[in-house]
């Protein structure tokens, strides 16, 4: 008690002083808050741009925690400005509508800001913000395009910010951010995302030594997350969705869980969108991991270098309606041609697809049901995917290894090698097919050559070939026994019994024939230039199959090879005549 009396006066004085400080701080908060509000309002009023209306609900400042709070910040486009976006005939700049319920800037260093013009902030927190981006859907014509000064997506090494001495943000967090991309001409939402989370850590602006008004951006880490989002892909005919997407700059890892790409419309409507036949895709993927992503390299240099892309448990369905004609004006490129034509540097050490399934189906005019080919237990390894010129000059070879079970039962393997240095884009492919019933080929060969296998066993098929962008040449050894087949009528439903009897009398029913060595036959196919790699490979193999089972086809295929190589009897006689003329 005596101690309390002794220090009573000091305690009272301290309490009064502390209370006074609190009152002063509270008064200052009101004053500073009012000043900041007036500054913001004046800045908005002085804007010369009348295309947007900017409003702020309330401004608060907490001097105890040095926190600035902005509530109900809205950026609204003028109605006439928005209406004019759809009426212009050429590409117009996109228009934004922004809603920010709450923006918190915490731990602001006032002293550094006043003394050094250095922006030092503990955290920048944005919650439940939403942006609508309105676009006219038009593309920029070549004459409207401005030349880029460099290949960088954005120059983070030279950010112009005159009037400040630098900056640091401990953490920039954007939570539950939403964005819509809206085509005003079609009244269609192209992209919609409503749960985007972004976190940037230790964001620094470092002044460039050779330019006092520009800064270099440094980031310690970036975390980016999205959940249950849906997007329309370019063209508007497919929808991309995923359950979760996450990116970590520290881990250099981008992950998608339960990703799918689906047609936007029914199959019949998708088919009707073109007057030509084309592939319709439907994809479900359990998980995708993209490793060793260097975000700084992508932004600064536009170089996309990844160590691996791993795709697990993919279900890929491809459908084509062959009632429609081919688009003969198309010129699909082969994989190595596509990489050589890239304008950006791309390098992926490996792409792995595992535990997957591919189903390809075609609906033919003369067949009631679609032809379906299924590759079960589908596993693919692609190595050395690159568009880097130095790598190509040094002789890098891109390789593809595919392992699967044809129609889910017969084991098969295909290897393809693309020497990227090849001037003629030469490539090689080889592989095998294991033991199974010949009937398994019916969905493939019936629409192609009108033959339906009734019995027979494939013991093994081995093949190898060399190809370029124009033709392929190779060889096949197809071992089988007890082959019998039917020749189908034009409607592909009924059997032509007479032709089937003739065919079975002529077809080579066993390879090897008893007491003979196995027949190895040539393969040849001249590429149809408006079709892709898959058709090129299959037609090459088809030439080997027909050359094996049909006696006359072996000499026909060999004749095609001789003509291509210039070694046919006709070519030899022509050269002999030319030599005789020279010697006269």
What are these regions (language model features)?
Residues 2, 37-45, 142-159, 163, ...:
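Sec-dependent signal peptide cleavage junction
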